Amino acid sequence: MSGRVFLLLALVALASAIQRIKLEKRTYTREQYKFGSIQEHLKAKYVPGYIPNKDAFNEGLSDYSNAQYYGPVTIGTPPQNFQVLFDTGSSNLWVPCANCPFGDIACRMHNRFDCKKSSSCTATGASFEIQYGTGSMKGTVDNDVVCFGHDTTYCTDKNQGLACATSEPGITFVAAKFDGIFGMGWDTISVNKISQPMDQIFANSAICKNQLFAFWLSRDANDITNGGEITLCDTDPNHYVGNIAWEPLVSEDYWRIKLASVVIDGTTYTSGPIDSIVDTGTSLLTGPTDVIKKIQHKIGGIPLFNGEYEVECSKIPSLPNITFNLGGQNFDLQGKDYILQMSNGNGGSTCLSGFMGMDIPAPAGPLWILGDVFIGRFYSVFDHGNKRVGFATSRTGK
């Protein structure tokens, strides 16, 4: 057999062994992007018992709405289509419900699931509630078939639990381009102890040889439609270069690992290994406030308000690399990676630092959160079977 034929067969085998989910993305104007609401959302997400400042939330979109990347799933028989945010920082699937009140604007502006129109759906009647900064997302639990993407290859059985939302809080989800949230964290943090859909996919060895999923995010500002891709059950070497550096999980709640160090121009900005959570559901990169302030000063950030720092757009090419050590390997963020360049509404651009200070008290913290600012530069692999997270340089990380 020639080498060319062997390579072709290998590529065909790889293609059949994994599922690819194309992601879409959305960008935001300076006016829409509010760090205060993002910070409150993350504290509500990661600090047990935290009572958010609702005024901060009402300044603008929450971090879920600022998250740029979402993709398709179907639910039910026949399939009902939804766009969902794939969130490694939570562990429940929920979509808007067909019977939500007429006055619930967020629900009415999105696709809604109707259990009565699905021959495979069972309405359990069990109540469901997730606390957000502007209130609670409330609904009931249904059981039905959930499929990744637009085909029926990677699907759960009809007993998969999901939340059908009848009430969505405040303005949090009104402007979101996605319909609901698809949690990809661990079942230990799942509301109502509902197992997530990936559990069933991982259990099906006929279609899933490796219990993992991977994110490749496109940060190309010139491509306004392609958001990237998620692969299920294997990695895709077309999306990264070099070896994957692995870091074991600290605990099976979030995708929590140890960050060894953060270094700029030879100066270390962290003191020893510190917990970090890899979160596809947040757009920023956060760390302890005292450390982030030093980083902002180093990159010439000008403090504004609510933790925002502005940087002159013209200085991006000369900004220093910021090096994160994970899994024994260094990962360099360049200025173009950690500066958010967005329209200011006047035909120009405003550049904001993608770093945000946030203090999370013990025992949950101190903590770094590696959001899309980091994941957009580095191919990120979430290995459920081996309880670890891996990173490699994205082939087109921009």
Swiss-Prot record:
Its EC number is 3.4.23.-. Residues 69-392 form the Peptidase A1 domain. Its main location: cytoplasm. GO terms for biological process: apoptotic process; programmed necrotic cell death; proteolysis. The keyword Glycoprotein applies. Highly expressed in intestine and to a lower extent in body wall muscles, hypodermis and neurons. GO terms for cellular component: cytoplasm; extracellular region; lysosome. Keywords: Aspartyl protease, Cytoplasm, Disulfide bond, Glycoprotein, Hydrolase, Lysosome, Necrosis, Protease, Secreted, Signal, Zymogen. It comes from the Eukaryota. GO terms for molecular function: aspartic-type endopeptidase activity. The active site is at D87, D279. Residues 18-55 form a propeptide. Transmembrane segments: none annotated. Glycans are attached at N321. InterPro entries: Aspartic_peptidase_A1, Aspartic_peptidase_AS, PEPTIDASE_A1, Peptidase_aspartic_dom_sf. Residues 1-17 form the signal peptide. It is found in: Cytoplasm; Lysosome; Secreted. Disulfide bonds join C100-C107, C313-C351. It is an enzyme of class 3 (hydrolase). Disruption phenotype: RNAi-mediated knockdown prevents neuronal degeneration in a mec-4(u231), deg-1(u38) or gsa-1(Q227L) gain-of-function mutant background. It holds the Pfam family Asp. Aspartic protease. Part of the necrosis cell death pathway. Involved in neuronal cell degeneration. Involved in heat stress response. Belongs to the peptidase A1 family. This is Aspartic protease 3. It comes from Caenorhabditis elegans. The gene is asp-3.
